[in-house]
From Swiss-Prot:
Family: Belongs to the cathelicidin family.
Post-translational modifications reported in the UniProt record: Proteolytically cleaved by proteinase PRTN3 into antibacterial peptide LL-37. Proteolytically cleaved by cathepsin CTSG and neutrophil elastase ELANE.
Region (Active core): 150-162
Annotated function: Antimicrobial protein that is an integral component of the innate immune system. Binds to bacterial lipopolysaccharides (LPS). Acts via neutrophil N-formyl peptide receptors to enhance the release of CXCL2. Postsecretory processing generates multiple cathelicidin antimicrobial peptides with various lengths which act as a topical antimicrobial defense in sweat on skin. The unprocessed precursor form, cathelicidin antimicrobial peptide, inhibits the growth of Gram-negative E.coli and E.aerogenes with efficiencies comparable to that of the mature peptide LL-37 (in vitro).
Domain notes: The cathelin-like domain (CLD), which is the propeptide part, does not seem to exhibit auto-inhibitory function, as it does not inhibit the antibacterial activity of antibacterial peptide LL-37.
Disulfide bridges in this chain: C86-C97, C108-C125
Single GO MF descriptor: lipopolysaccharide binding
InterPro entries xref list: Cathelicidin-like, Cathelicidin_CS, Cathlecidin_C, Cystatin_sf
A Pfam family matched in the record: Cathelicidins
Residue numbers covered by the propeptide annotation in the UniProt entry: 31-131
Name of the molecule in the record: Cathelicidin antimicrobial peptide
Compartment annotation: Secreted; Vesicle
PANTHER family linked: CATHELICIDIN (PTHR10206), CATHELICIDIN ANTIMICROBIAL PEPTIDE (PTHR10206:SF2)
């Protein structure tokens, strides 16, 4: 009488289960997004929710902060997007679109989850005022330098004219 232990099908099933056990962790690891991939997905979501006419594309990604290894923990992100020439209704990827000259720039901050199965993000974007502030600082510095230079020139003219006045002999 044969037992199940002697059955060749039991050996095959054991081998199949062993192989599945080895392959499954690899499948789980493959579902974890990189930091940049998670940000690009978040930008896709931003483009879908946007009421603006054109798509936005990643302009600048801030360095990745140190993170724990848990892909289900929200990770902080900050990046800048810029308006492209592609209308929001296009089927093109934003990466295939050129930036719009003088397009709107937005600063985005929030969190993403790297687990591809959860595909979750919480991002808010505001018009990037840093560029305007930098331009304002530039003009203020130019004004200060010109103003300071004009004062010096004015003082030198005064001194020069003061030396031209004839001196009376006592």
């Amino acid at each position: 009488m044969k037992t199940q232990r002697d059955s060749p099908s039991l050996g095959r099933w054991s081998l199949v289960l062993l192989l599945l056990g080895l392959v499954m962790p690899l499948a789980i690891v493959a579902q974890v997004l990189s930091y940049q991939e998670a940000v690009l997905r978040a930008i896709d979501g931003i483009n879908q929710r946007s009421s603006d006419a054109n798509l936005y594309r990643l302009l600048d990604l801030d360095p990745r902060p140190t993170m724990d290894g848990d892909p289900d923990t929200p990770k902080p992100v900050s990046f800048t997007v810029k308006e492209t020439v592609c209308p929001r209704t296009t089927q093109k990827s934003p990466e295939d679109c050129d930036f719009k000259e003088d397009g709107l720039v937005k600063r985005c901050v929030g969190t993403v989850i790297l687990n591809q199965a959860r595909d979750s993000f919480d991002i808010s974007c505001d018009k990037d005022n840093r560029r305007s502030a930098r331009l304002g600082n530039f003009f203020r510095k130019v004004k200060e330098k010109i103003g300071g230079g004009l004062k010096k020139v004015g003082q030198k003219i005064k001194d020069f004219l003061g030396n031209l006045v004839p001196r009376t002999a006592s």
